[in-house]
């Protein structure tokens, strides 16, 4: 029995070593990688076009940025990422995207965006704070698509914002 467990662990180790990690992330409990189908759906709902100025305010590993790139390769994107290691990863893998490393709530771009696509942090109501902040950066007539919790607090806070 002990030998079998040791063998299975070794087999898993070999599989893991054969993969390149998306990024080395240390101690970030607020990082939730958005699965590809959800990313594609967010981009589809945003109706992204080449002429749009797009913001991804919690870029993480770049899953949403990749979906944007796949859908509209020439789209102009900016991204914000709090974690310095992830910001470096994003800059290396998305050189065409302007990356700002810092707290999105303190981000002050020169211009507003026509599209904002996001999966904000959910801890202690951060999703609502990030969505409200994102709306202040959206051009009139712009589109924001995002993921947030679906609890009573979120429903109440976002009810007046949805159309």
Where are each of the predicted segments found?
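Class I S-adenosyl-L-methionine-dependent methyltransferase catalytic core
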Residues: 1-163
